[in-house]
Amino acid sequence: AVVRADTLGKPWAVAELKRTRETILKASAQDTTLRPFVLHHNWVVNTPMETGIADPDKARRALETARKFTNPFGVFVTGIDRDETAGQQEGSFEGSKVFSYTGAVMTLPTGVQAIAENNYGNPDQALGYLLRMSRSFSYAHPGSMYEVSPDYGMLVQAWNVYSFAVPVVHQFFGIDPMAARKEIRIRPQMPASWNQCSLENVRIGDNQISVHYEKTEDGTIKLTVLQDRGDWQILLQPGAEDPSLPKVLKGDAERTQEDGQWVLRCSGEQIQITYNLN
């Protein structure tokens, strides 16, 4: 790792790796204290936040650290390939003339990081990663992005769907289906800049739903859900501690409590509520 960093001309990484080596060599063989460390800062160290298994406090610190390993197009695959300006660039980038995975920024680790940010309640940061990826949208293939940003590797990559669909559908709009039970749980977690947005014709089993979100200047949120099958249950979780705060404008709704949170169990082809975030 030291040789790689030195060859690439990354003095910050060389210094960090040498400190890590000294710490390891000084440690006593009888000392069983856990001392986790990383060498290459590979993006896979962020998967505990992607899967949601990291403790919130540790996750917060790890997410802050990960933001330093970015360029205008997303997250570096191998963190020691970045330079001292990484995490600060917003409008400039100079790529290599010959393709190499060394120094690569890819849509997979960037999408993973967006999902991780959403898992810990940071939709604005998640949107930032999506916007970085979208800078290479349609560079070569209309409607698609390269495997490696901005224009290297495979020109079509399946994991791009994961990198965008999970943050937008499952996390921003909060759609969490359980088709076998004919239930769809919805709890939006929108970026602050998204005051009005819609996601239409999402097919779930033999049902199809559309979700419309609107936030007014006073912070009131109007959420409208349309579905083809009115006998399916829509479980809305507006995040209000007071169960009387969500106002049901359309549809049938029953207020219930699950795991200490209030849930509106709704039915009908059109459901509409208003509420304010805590």
Where are these regions (language model features)?
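Active-site core of glycosidic bond-cleaving carbohydrate-active enzymes
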Residues: 1-178, 232
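Non-catalytic C-terminal accessory modules of carbohydrate-active enzymes
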Residues: 112-278
